[in-house]
Amino acid sequence: AMLCTAGATVIAELSDAPMSSTSRRDTMTALEVYTRRLHYGCVSAAPSSGESTTDKSYYGLCLVTDDGETLSVSENGSGMAVSELDIFNLNDARMRSQTYADAPRMPIARYTWELHLAETRLTRRIKREPFVPDGHIAEFAERCLTIQATGLIKRMEYTNCWRPVIGVSGGVDSTLVMLACAKAMDICGLPRKNIVAVTMPCFGTTDRTKNNAITIAEQLGAELRVIPIGESVKKHFETIGHDFNDHSVVFENAQARERTMVLLDIANKVDGLDVGTKDLSEQADGWCTYNGDQISNYDINAGMTKTMVRAVVKYISETTEDKVLAGALHDIWDTPVTPELLPIGDEGELLQKSEDSVGPYILQDFFLYHMVMRGGSPAKVLRLAELAFKGEFDHDTLVHWLRSYCR
């Protein structure tokens, strides 16, 4: 800690821990905990087998650990672990942390030497979905739902409004909100009929999404209301003098605002709360209608990125005992992300897909994490993306969507 508070971002450690049945795992765990708490990189090396004596054995365990993540470990006593430490990320994490705010600065000896900078090939693994853990997905999904449910419960307590009102579209975002609201009702010991699920088909609604929305509401035991808004929107177009065949932003936003008005009015009518469905990815990108889906009484998806939402919905689809619910959840997970604000095709097919406009959400969330959460420059993020998505997206595609994201 003294070295870190003095400014050290990388600590080279000579370890004297002998080999045991648990020493490898114990050393990895300890370094992950320490480096995460103090935000530093550690290069650790233990004695090789040549140092083994009568009562102690060594096998040259070497590790490279970066801010809580083990990047490289020597295997079978090879005594070699190679990886890269991200100094920029470490400094950025320290600026965001309270650990160093009031930490005392201790006097230390300082030595200087010359370093030659050179760009090398990156060897460390870069996660494609940085917001979603590699393992323990069950714990991750349950924690996400619990956090959403407990936040909603507290808001309902403050307002004394115990009826969540949700616009259900048949997409992953509103589906996750339905699941979280059902969990909130279960925790409170309230009937799930307190949930008012409202589906509002209009010009861009497909049978697939409408049927999935109805199935989710019915299987979760919510009160279902099907309210077509097409005629109301057409009347609004007449009022403002907008041509129905002009599929501009007016055409799209009028539908989104009509849905929001219906939800807020129903919430007033049942003494409830309009629970929003927009997620963090959409908010960060501005992919929502101002005074439409951009507003609600309480938004429990605000801290969930699109990849997180999809991961939780997929997990529930694979673990629920309700086969009908599981089928609908899987189909929702498999449905292209869409606001359904433009008319469908002649054969009822979906024509408007969000990812055609804003880019693949797996890239959106990757950019969000490395630029906003980690403070990376566009050039750095592009280099990381080329490594993470090698073979999936070419250079020109990554540049195109990164420019779009930074615009």
Language-model features and meaning:
Residues 1-8, 31-32, 150-156, 281-282:
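Structured alpha-helical segments in the cores of large, soluble enzyme domains
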Residues 39-40, 51-52, 66, 84, ...:
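ATP/NTP-dependent adenylation/nucleotidyl-transfer catalytic domains that generate, transfer
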